[in-house]
Design a protein with these regions (language model features):
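Extreme N-terminal segment that seeds HTH/winged-HTH DNA-binding domains in transcriptional regulators
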Residues: 1-40
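A short, conserved structural fragment
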Residues: 54-62
């Protein structure tokens, strides 16, 4: 595995990392089929992107065994999840969109957000700790708060 180049990942790379993170919540290793389904892309497109992600140190991919995030990939995935969830809060609390509208618009808009814009939106939205759907928002350092929610 090569060291991280210091280059910012593309929007597509960030999207893959965030989806791998979400899928790893259910299983430590993510299949390329489940990743293709989740991203709504053709299965042959997955290995090409995984090769790019592995070359900069974001993932470990073993063909036919699956993919998992490295620590660097996990950090980047959490930054992307932060962007998306802050954008959702901003769209609801500042712009007046409904939760479902906010999610749809956030899917379209979050790839274009940089950290500076994300932090400004967080400030305008009152430094939220949860998205409109109740999910925790990672902090600026990519740490998720400990959640002690109880299902009722």
């Amino acid at each position: 595995m090569e060291a991280h180049s210091g280059m910012e990942p593309s929007a597509a790379m960030r999207e893959y990392l965030a989806e791998i993170y979400r899928l790893q919540e259910d299983s430590p290793t993510v299949s390329t089929t489940s990743l293709a389904d989740r991203l709504n892309v053709s299965p042959p497109a997955i290995p090409r992107m995984l090769k790019r992600l592995q070359s900069v140190g974001y993932v470990k991919h073993v063909p036919y065994q699956g993919v998992e995030l490295t620590e660097l990939g996990r950090e980047e995935a959490l930054r992307e999840i932060r962007r998306h969830r802050i954008l959702e809060v901003f769209l609801v609390s500042v712009m007046g969109f409904t939760w479902d509208e906010a999610h749809e618009h956030a899917d379209d808009l979050s790839p274009g957000l940089n950290n500076r814009l994300t932090e400004r939106m967080a400030e305008m939205a009152g430094q939220p700790t949860r998205c409109p759907h109740g999910e925790p928002i990672p902090d600026r350092d990519g740490r998720l708060p400990v959640v002690n929610d109880v299902c009722v």
